[in-house]
Each structure stands twice: as C-alpha cells, then as structure tokens.
Amino acid sequence: VAEQAMILPVDPDPLLITTSKGDVRLDVEVTDTQVEHARGLMFRPPLPQGRGMLFVMGEEELQVFWMRNTPSPLDLIFAAKDGSIVSIKQGEPLSEAQIPSDKPAKYVLEVAQGEAARLGIQPGDRMRHRLIQP
C-alpha cells in the first residue's frame, strides 16, 4: 500500500511575517495534533511560493524535526511563543538527520527551501496569525 500525503485545508487567515522589507503574507495549512505533526509534508510535491505549513506545538521548548519521507527540500522557520523567529534551518529531502531549533520554539513554519531568503525572513522577525498568542 502506497503512503498517502496529508492535505489540510488552507487556513482562512494568512500568516504574516514582519521583515525588514515589510510584511510578507503566506497561505498556510495548520497542523495542531500529534498525528498531523508526525505526517507534515511527507509524500507531498513541492510547495508553491507563498504557501507553507504551520506547526502549532504543544509547548514552547527545543523542537527537533526531520525530513523522513519528505521529497522536497524545505526551510524550517522556528518561532517562540510570541511569534519571534529564533532560527531558520534547511531540511534536505528524505533525510532522517535531526533538525533542531537553536532556542525554545512553539511554532514551526515549513516553506519551500529558499523561500526564507527570497522573502527576506530572518531571525528576530515576527510571525503573526490568530493562533499565535504572544
């Protein structure tokens, strides 16, 4: 039996990131359960520009992700409880190497690799969304 990709609806509220260049708007799918966190973008084709997956984790703590069964390279953007970005890491396709946040994070945004640089997103920038409660 072939594994199936998890496709979630795009949240009606965009995620905004305030950067030095201004606000960036992304349409996101939101994962907020352990089952959804475990599946993430596994078996999915590459995300288009302007799209992402927002992981709402249970606690603000050091987060560790991996790219198992994820065929597309990603930028992983880790943010604290207040939405401030604490680190940005790159994930390589299908790798089981651990990708840790540098500091405690409550939110993780996955976008296509290169999107963070293209959009000017850097540590210290702030993510805003109805689910991010500072």
Language-model features and meaning:
Residues 2-134:
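Compact, glycine-rich, soluble single-domain proteins
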